[in-house]
Amino acid sequence: RPAKLEDESARQFNGLRRDSDWVNADITVSTSADQVPVAPGYKVSDTTADGRRTIRYKSDAPIQNFFSVQSARYAVATDRWKDVELAVYHDPAHGYNVERMNTAMKASLDYFTAHFSPFQFRQVRILEFPAYADFAQSFANTIPYSEGIGFIADYRDPEKIDMVTYITAHEVGHQWWGHQVISSDQQGGT
């Protein structure tokens, strides 16, 4: 349970982690040669040798010490919003809602940039993960997203609520609320 607002000592901790704050990420991931490893930051090298693919990602500004690393045999659908690269990494057989996700990312970036502040990253990436859980979560310029709630959801019925757009907008919003502005570990925080 978060500390009460009157507890000034709790202001030294952010709402995500009590043991660390902002870090300069420099992450190297090695995986099978046929997979695409993804981590927060920007790709600075990509090599394949002896059946292994190794990619190094580095942030150009401090990020929260709160991130995920994923690797899979992804297909990648890219798009752009102004000078921001958009990418959806997905199972090649799960392209059903990729265009919907890209459209939602663009609409979210339009809205949040107009109403809050400029977007702080040069890219936004959505990454599919297996439906062992049904959630999406926002990390610095990287949004892991369950196949069950986004990639294989059937939205051909126009009467069905478009949860893919809502969830994508919510997670893009966390690129501001949690990765640009963050509350202390006190009641009322996000």
Regions found by a protein language model. Give the residues of each.
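Catalytic Zn2+-binding segment of zinc metalloproteases
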Residues: V172-Q187
